[in-house]
């Protein structure tokens, strides 16, 4: 049985109770947080441009 799971997650993901051979490939793409020039109204806003975590899990039983 071959299960391929592609789950976008934010934060931590815990995997427990996995049996058999397991190949885990994590591709984390996260851009730097850019701060624009200070705005006189609110002192500038922190903008998180991209925060994406891709988890590819392959189970071979």
Curated annotation (Swiss-Prot):
One of its GO terms (biological process) is transport of virus in host, cell to cell. Keywords: RNA-binding, Transport, Viral movement protein. Residues 28-37 have a biased composition (Basic and acidic residues). It comes from the Viruses. InterPro entries: Tombusvirus_movement. GO terms for molecular function: RNA binding. Residues 17-35 are annotated as: RNA-binding. Residues 1-45 are annotated as: Disordered. Cell-to-cell movement. Displays RNA-binding activity. Belongs to the carmovirus double gene block protein 1 family. Homodimer. This is Double gene block protein 1. The lineage of its organism: Viruses, Riboviria, Orthornavirae, Kitrinoviricota, Tolucaviricetes.
């Amino acid at each position: 049985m071959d299960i391929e799971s592609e789950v976008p997650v934010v934060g931590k993901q815990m995997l427990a109770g996995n049996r058999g051979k397991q190949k885990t490939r994590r591709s984390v793409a996260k851009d730097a947080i850019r701060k624009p020039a200070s705005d006189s109204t609110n002192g500038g806003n922190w903008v998180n441009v991209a925060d994406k975590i891709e988890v590819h899990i392959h189970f071979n039983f």
